[in-house]
Amino acid sequence: MAAAALQLRQSLCPGPRVLRTFSSVASPAAPRAGPRTASRSERPMRRKALPPRTEKMDTDQDWPSVYPTAAPFKPSAVPLPVRMGYPVKKGVPMAKEGNLELLKIPNFLHLTPVAIKRHCAALKDFCTEWPAALDSDEKCEEHFPVEIDTADYVSSGPSIRNPKARAVTLRVKLSSLNLDNHAKKKLIKLVGERYCKATDVLTITTDRCPLKRQNYDYAVYLLTVLYHESWKTEDWENSKTEEDMDEYVWAKSSSENSVLQTLLQMRAAESSVAPSREELLGTKEVEDYQKCVVRLKNEGENEASLAQYKESVKRLLNLA
């Protein structure tokens, strides 16, 4: 039985068996190809830096074409050995190349005499002679009552813009506007502290819009709205009494009616012809009495106002 099994095994594996040995030493890996180093002749040539623009400039070049408008300092466009900065260890101040101090301050390289002359020549066609009739400030204020104030700023920085430059101030005297007594009082009530009673000047300042032109249009719009609103009369304004008035008005008041009735009775007793209402209001005694009463009501009582009121009553009643 064992001999038969051995013969069968030999028939299945006819060749001799070879035992494989195990080793702890790893076989060396195949060498990898490293990066190929190009030779100096095969390397691309670096592009040389171009010389500064200032070295190519001619001495008789057109400078307004180089610096046409206001702009930060450009070292490559200014052929001047400009230096600025604090010298380190008593050395030479910093040159213009890469100097941030020159960028902080404003420059006027665009305002050369030649550039200013060209600007004046270009604007000359749009300029007219000053009107001969406007030979005084009073006439200018009469024909041009609205005054517009704006401001331009020069900032120390790379930007030539300033947010404060967009503010616009409009000034106008209320006496130059076509306003009656009611419209003037209502406009003063609407504007509040923007009106100066001592100078009779209304001041409107606008700075909400990002552009100066927009703020100018907004200021003119506000003035237009205030003017038209002041002329409107609401229903509740007609029902106001003397106690509701912000300022005492003598016309059509109880004081005026009392004075007229008293004077009419006195004149009727003296003569048979009674004067008219307009004649009594036009006399000097009634006008002085009116001024004293208005001053006493609006400004309050004091020794001077009471003394003036006393004298006006004496003259009105022929007691002086």
UniProtKB/Swiss-Prot annotation:
Q: Name one GO biological process term.
A: mitochondrial translation
UniProt keyword Metal-binding, yes or no:
no
- Give the subcellular location: Mitochondrion
Its main subcellular localisation, reduced to a broad class, is mitochondrion
The molecular function terms of the Gene Ontology recorded here are: structural constituent of ribosome
The protein's organism comes out as: Mus musculus
Q: InterPro entries under this entry?
A: Ribosomal_mS35_mit, Ribosomal_mS35_mt
Query: GO CC: one term?
Result: mitochondrion
Which family does the entry's similarity section mention? Belongs to the mitochondrion-specific ribosomal protein mS35 family.
Q: Which UniProt keywords apply?
A: Mitochondrion, Ribonucleoprotein, Ribosomal protein, Transit peptide
Assembly and interactions? Component of the mitochondrial ribosome small subunit (28S) which comprises a 12S rRNA and about 30 distinct proteins.
| Disordered, as annotated region | 24-63
Q: Which gene encodes it?
A: Mrps35
Q: What is this protein called?
A: Small ribosomal subunit protein mS35
